[in-house]
């Protein structure tokens, strides 16, 4: 089996897509939190949003690295 070559040309786009979707998920969860009276659901969604925000920090760092590498020709 041949390994695929490392093609990173669209990594920035993929990461940006994931950032956008994660932000949308956070906003949707915030809407549910505001509307629901179910404390268990609120707690679960708040915890999930905390993890999402941590993931966003990591993705933002990763996109900076990828953008820099893309600019430098992926050396």
From Swiss-Prot:
Q: Which domain of life is it from?
A: Bacteria
The protein's matches in Pfam families, at most eight in alphabetical order, are given as: Tlp
Q: Where is this region: Disordered?
A: 52-75
The record, for InterPro entries, names: SASP_thioredoxin-like
Q: To which protein family does this belong?
A: Belongs to the Tlp family.
Q: Which NCBIfam families does the record cross-reference, listed alphabetically?
A: SASP_tlp
In terms of HAMAP family, this protein maps to: Tlp
Q: What is this protein called?
A: Protein Tlp homolog
**Lineage of this protein's species?**
Bacteria, Bacillati, Bacillota, Clostridia, Eubacteriales
**Gene behind the chain:** tlp
């Amino acid at each position: 089996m041949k390994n695929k070559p490392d093609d990173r040309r669209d990594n920035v786009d993929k990461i940006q897509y994931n950032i956008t979707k994660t932000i949308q998920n956070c906003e949707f969860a915030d809407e549910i939190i505001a509307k629901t009276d179910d404390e268990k659901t609120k707690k679960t969604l708040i915890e999930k949003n905390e993890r999402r925000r941590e993931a966003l920090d990591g993705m933002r760092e990763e996109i900076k690295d990828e953008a820099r590498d893309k600019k430098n020709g992926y050396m």
